[in-house]
Every structure is written in structure tokens, then in C-alpha cells.
Curated annotation (Swiss-Prot):
It comes from Haemophilus influenzae (strain PittGG). The lineage of its organism: Bacteria, Pseudomonadati, Pseudomonadota, Gammaproteobacteria, Pasteurellales. This is Integration host factor subunit beta. GO terms for molecular function: DNA binding; structural constituent of chromatin. Pfam families: Bac_DNA_binding (PF00216). Belongs to the bacterial histone-like protein family.
Amino acid sequence: MTKSELMEKLSAKQPTLPAKEIENMVKDILEFISQSLENGDRVEVRGFGSFSLHHRQPRLGRNPKTGDSVNLSAKSVPYFKAGKELKARVDVQA
């Protein structure tokens, strides 16, 4: 689902709210999550999951095209861990 599809579904579910207001709310929520991660904070949405940063150590990588070794610096990457309720909802037993 894309951000625009999410906004369309929210507009259909809440027809009394203007589409522009829904768009602004979705953008604000995503911006708040991004800012929190940028500040090094963890964001937890109970029943859904949590967003945090994982820190990658510097390492020696390889250029796949040339095969040359490349030094990769340390970096932080966003990480999402699904909550118990979300895991239970998507765990479809075949």
C-alpha cells in the first residue's frame, strides 16, 4: 500500500474530513516518526510495532562490479519490529 492509497482509504472511511486534512495528518505522522528516529528516539505504537535505529559497524565491503574491496563507514539504519497483535493478524496458517 502506498501513502496515496492509505490516504484514499482513510478518506473513504472518514468522509466528513476533507481529503487535504487527511493528507496533512498522514504526512505529519510520518514526519514525527522520522524526526524521532533522527533524534535517536524509539517510536512505539502499541499493538502495531516499534520503530528504532540499528547501528551498523564499519566493515570491509566489495564492489560487485569490479571485485575491489571498499571500506564502508558506520551508519544507522531504521528498523521496524512488528508487535504481537500485528504478528498474530498476519500469521495465516495454511
